[in-house]
Amino acid sequence: MNKQSWLLNLSLLKTHPAFRAVFLARFISIVSLGLLGVAVPVQIQMMTHSTWQVGLSVTLTGGAMFVGLMVGGVLADRYERKKVILLARGTCGIGFIGLCLNALLPEPSLLAIYLLGLWDGFFASLGVTALLAATPALVGRENLMQAGAITMLTVRLGSVISPMIGGLLLATGGVAWNYGLAAAGTFITLLPLLSLPALPPPPQPREHPLKSLLAGFRFLLASPLVGGIALLGGLLTMASAVRVLYPALADNWQMSAAQIGFLYAAIPLGAAIGALTSGKLAHSARPGLLMLLSTLGSFLAIGLFGLMPMWILGVICLALFGWLSAVSSLLQYTMLQTQTPEAMLGRINGLWTAQNVTGDAIGAALLGGLGAMMTPVASASASGFGLLIIGVLLLLVLVELRRFRQTPPQVTASDS
């Protein structure tokens, strides 16, 4: 038997052409969305000089994404998934063209930016849900951990590159260039996605979309295993909202403007290391227990983060959180895909992704409230240790998740 390496195995990109096409499309899409993410707030700030108006655009887009995830989950379980993915990407690109044309006007319309933000948020999340539901069919359920780790690396790398490119474009050509290249990138992603095989949903009875969505909710609530995974995911996302305290904590540590960047880079760096060293995760006999313990460790890291006497120690705590949260997230993703019936994959993936979106918003709001009553140090520690207490309770309550065992996949020569 070959020894499995700790390092991430990228062979899936070579052996599975369909996954390679998705990998390429996702990377281009992340870079394109990053260009958009830089341009929209800058344009609104330049037009209105109001941070409230910038925040409103983020809130509207987030709301549209939530609705898109719900609708996308139902569509992915009822219609051919490749068509849903292509339709969502193409429609999203049309919205980017609208933003580009609006930016070229002598007096761009603020209302148009808001409406197109709703449009793009809805259709972007629609395609995400269908793609998640299709992944097991593209790579095989035995390769989901590897696929999830490669995807996580793609997201992290794209998230680092795209803001830098977006900033350079803003400095040289203005927001219209950002929107135009985002539209071009989105339409380019259609080329590799066209090579995907047909991805029909499993046969199931026709029912009203709301009834179908409620069936997904009922399954989530009735399954201690899948429901517990989703709950842990939401709490983990809440913990990541600690970034709203970075500016205040930077003042407390007397950090320079250049040093503050280390705080923002620490969690993505830790997550990237977690993905790169995930080679043995798929071979864990008790993934549920490992998920619970890594989640508890990540909460502890956030609790200790604000208490550190030096900023460099705080950065180490954040990197540790990034690593542990990556381990937990990869286990969540894999177990969710393998333990959810094929007929429910679209809806459950939509609900899981939606609770991640809302968890981040709730966490930011709670930390903002704590910040009004406590010092930044106390707020960060209270959030981390509070989540740690909840996590310990869940460790005791989620018996089925804690005791879950799986037969590790066989290691073949190509995997080593």
Swiss-Prot record:
Periplasmic face residues: 43-55, 105-109, 178, 240-256, 308-313, 378
The principal localisation class reads: membrane
Which compartment or compartments is the protein found in?
A: Cell inner membrane
SUPFAM superfamilies noted in UniProt: MFS general substrate transporter
Pfam families in the cross-refs: MFS_3
Q: How does it sit in the membrane?
A: Multi-pass membrane protein
Q: Which domain of life is it from?
A: Bacteria
* Residues exposed to the Cytoplasmic side: 1-21, 77-83, 131-156, 200-218, 278-287, 337-356, 400-416
Keywords of the record: Cell inner membrane, Cell membrane, Membrane, Transmembrane, Transmembrane helix, Transport
Query: GO molecular function terms here?
Result: enterobactin transmembrane transporter activity
Q: Which InterPro entries match?
A: Enterobactin_exp_EntS, MFS_dom, MFS_trans_sf, TM_effector
Annotated transmembrane regions: 22-42, 56-76, 84-104, 110-130, 157-177, 179-199, 219-239, 257-277, 288-307, 314-336, 357-377, 379-399
Q: GO CC terms for this protein?
A: plasma membrane
Q: What is its biological role? A: Component of an export pathway for enterobactin.
HAMAP family attached here? MFS_EntS
Indicate the family of this protein: Belongs to the major facilitator superfamily. EntS (TC 2.A.1.38) family.
The name under which this protein is listed is: Enterobactin exporter EntS
Naturally occurring in which organism (per UniProt): Escherichia coli O81 (strain ED1a)
